[in-house]
């Protein structure tokens, strides 16, 4: 299977998001990379489903809460920017203060 670097990045994020979901199910708090991967995956999949950019920007800030991440992680993440593929092309989605 020949994958482009972008496709490899997408797969890595998706796998990290799967790990993050499993940890949340077990009650384990997420670290920085897991939290970012989970929110990023939410945005990427929402874009593929055709959800509008503005909706993803707002909903992306409600994927996980401070109680679900390790101490200090929420303060480390001010913005998450994701290049996501929408039905009408690729767009940059920014989620401000994604962990509240």
Curated annotation (Swiss-Prot):
It is an enzyme of class 3 (hydrolase). It catalyses: urea + 2 H2O + H(+) = hydrogencarbonate + 2 NH4(+). It is found in: Cytoplasm. Disulfide bonds: none annotated. One of its GO terms (cellular component) is cytoplasm. Pathway: Nitrogen metabolism; urea degradation; CO(2) and NH(3) from urea (urease route): step 1/1. Keywords: Cytoplasm, Hydrolase. Gene3D superfamilies: Urease, gamma-like subunit. One of its GO terms (molecular function) is urease activity. It holds the Pfam family Urease_gamma. Its EC number is 3.5.1.5. Heterotrimer of UreA (gamma), UreB (beta) and UreC (alpha) subunits. Three heterotrimers associate to form the active enzyme. This is Urease subunit gamma.
